[in-house]
Amino acid sequence: MRLTGVSRGSAWTGLSVTTTLPNPSTRPGLRLPGRVTLAADGGEDVLVRHIRLGLVAQVEPEDPGSPRRLVQYHQWPIAGRFVVPGGRRRAVDFAVPLPWETPVTVFGGVPLMTLRTGLRTEVSVEPDLDQGEMVPVLVHPLPTQQHLLAALDTLGFVMRQAGLQQGRLPRVAQTLPFQQRLGFWAAPLYAGPMTELEVIMLTDPAGMEVLFWLDRRLSLAGVTHQSISRFRVWHAGADRRDWVSTVDGWLRHAIDRHAAAAAHADWSATIRESAHVSRHPDQPVAPGYGLGGTAGGAGVGGGGGGGDGT
């Protein structure tokens, strides 16, 4: 697959910009290769001051009443001053490293609900600034992210929403100005202690920090109780881990903390069944099962102890 973004030719600068990604599919932390081609459409030479690339995405503001807005969350300079001769073309190749916290937009080969991210090219030509059309970037999960989401699917969680929330989390080593949040309806085994589960995944070169945000509606009037638990897992050895047992252990730990923080509530957090019998082993998880949700999209097949939790 090859994706291309082309800017409109600028009558002021006489320059058109084309950005091409030979393979738009990638993962957080990997390099994204491509080429920016500039064409001086008129007979005059064009002096280019710089070329920059930026990653952009739709982000939910901290004020829930405000609409989503397009945010450029990372930028790379790829070229300094040079001249494009009149009637000629100039190509600039690049291979830029994606941030480790780049939001995942594709899961199980399917777009993850409405989440999108794109690459935008900025060309500075005195005194104008040309921004080319955005080129979609298809960000697939890292193995640790893949295993986590597959385990949640195997345990019976159903995705209900996915988005990017502006702001920084306290006491978390966060590098981007937002977090990717994935919301799930609680699986039947865990539906007593909680109503909804929100998952935040923050990755770095060594591993992944996972935040489980539990929410339980305590009354028909809409009163809720929320709590957050944090866990850490390493990329090394991810394929050898029993992810269903790991995630089930995280959930039970989070539910215990959730119950302790809401000791006044008239409900019990005890879970007596095993996670491994919530779905019969003779019923494998088919690709696309479970992450259908109410907001669209489809998802993932099964996954398969430990991890530090707080």
How should these model regions be labeled?
Residues 126-153:
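Short beta-strand elements
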Residues 55-69, 217-223:
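Short aromatic-acidic-glycine turn motif
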Residues 1-12:
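A eukaryote-biased signal for short, well-structured alpha-helical docking elements
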Residues 66-109, 129-131:
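A beta-strand/beta-hairpin structural motif
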Residues 53-58, 95-101, 109-128:
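Internal, hydrophobic beta-strand segments that form the core of beta-sheet-rich folds
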Residues 40-49:
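A short beta-turn/strand-edge loop motif at beta-sheet boundaries
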